[in-house]
Every structure is written in structure tokens, then in C-alpha cells.
Amino acid sequence: MSGTPTGTSAAKVVIAAAMHRESECVIDTLELLGIGQDRQRVLHSDDLSVAEAVEQGAEAVAGAAGLVLCGGGDVAPRRYGEAALPWVRISIQKGRDEMEWAMLDAAREHRVPVWGICRGFQTLNVYLGGTLWQDLPTQVSNTLAHHLSSPRDALIHDVEVTPEGRGSGLGEVLARERCLVNSRHHQAIRELGDGLVPVARSADGVVEAVVLDDPDWWLEGVEWHPENLMPLPQQRAVAQRFADAVEARAGG
């Protein structure tokens, strides 16, 4: 793998999604954190052929200052060796999968910081060899309610820092005070991907935050949607960690 290219202040943050409604709040959040739209490149897989999405995604990330994988539909279960449950098939975003795998290949090669949100969090896990529960309500007993789509900023359960996560920067942010989160997912990490550290879990054991144990590649993800919770200092600090990683890379 090649080393990190020399960063410049002009390097952009790539935002990956299938469509605008998945990326709009992330665009606004990055702008709030000082990464304006002139420093963002948004790629929507639904606007491109699969070949275009793969080519443009890899090219964009290779020279990027950061990559955000937004929330959205489901990762194809075939990527972790399973057949899709019948009701999961309709929400699979195959074109987005292809684009994001190419993006992550480029990010890993060039050590581009990556932040995964909800579906993006799950994508990171599968990319690194992990698996998912395809549908928590039907596959796992006695779980919390993990899906409330509206209002987007409704805080519906706590997350708690794990013993493994206490030494991480993300763990320190989440341990500052009680951490309540919004939640709108029906899938979850089942087996962790290679190198991922479970930083936080909900009371039912569902993994809610991860970091990659690799000093040369900044990669973090959360199962909730901090981009909808920017008025809360703790949640803004979660997002700020990515912004800081972007600025460190852009500054070379």
C-alpha cells in the first residue's frame, strides 16, 4: 500500500450516499464544522451507472481529505456470505455498495480518514470482514427499540462506553456524560470486522460505535445519526473528531 500523499487545504471531503435526502444533513454538519461546500464532493450512486460510480468514487477518494459514508438502505447480505431475508431485498442498495467498496479500497490505500454513520457504520464492518444481523426485531430477542424515523432528533436510548473503548478518543467523548442517541436502523453488527474495536454498546448489547485499531488509518463509525444532533455538545464533539482528522490530513 502506498503512503499518504502530501495534503493540501484544497483537498475535498467526499460524501457518499445513494440520494440527496441521505446526504443533506451531513453536508450541513460539515459546513457547521468549518468544512464548507466548496471543500465537499458529494457522490450519489443513484445518479450514476455502477461503472461511473465505481470509477468516480475511487478517483475522488484517492485524493481526498476525508470520506463520509452516510446512512441509507441495506448492505447486500451476499457481501457477508448470507442470502437476503425476503423483506430485506427491497432495501438493498447494490449500486451504492459497489461505489463504496471502491471508495474504501482507495481510502485504505491512501490512508484517507473515514467516518461511517448508520448504514455507513455497517458498511465499514462488512468491508473489514464482519457480518450483520439482517433484521434485529426478527432475529434477536429482547432488543431495544432501535428504529424511530421521526422526529430525526428524538433521543430514544443510551449508549455506554465498553471497557475496550475507554482508551480511545471517541470513548472519551462518549464517556463525558450520559450519552443519549437517536436511532433509526433495523440492522446491526453481528460479528466485528478485522481490527475494529467496539467503543460503545446499547443496553441490549448492540454495538453502537467502533474505531479501527490502526495508528496509520483513522476510521470511526457510529450507529446513530449525530448529524441530526448538532445542538448537543457531546454529539458535535463526535462529529468534530472527523473534522479534526480531515484538517490534519489536509494540512499534510
Give residue ranges: language-model regions:
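N-terminal beta1-alpha1 cap of cysteine-dependent amidohydrolase-like domains
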Residues: 1-113, 125-126, 133, 137-171, ...
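The feature captures the ABC ATPase H-loop/switch
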Residues: 121
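Short, basic/aromatic beta-hairpin or loop at an interaction surface
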Residues: 174-175
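Active-site-proximal beta-strand elements of phosphoester/diester hydrolases
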Residues: 219-224
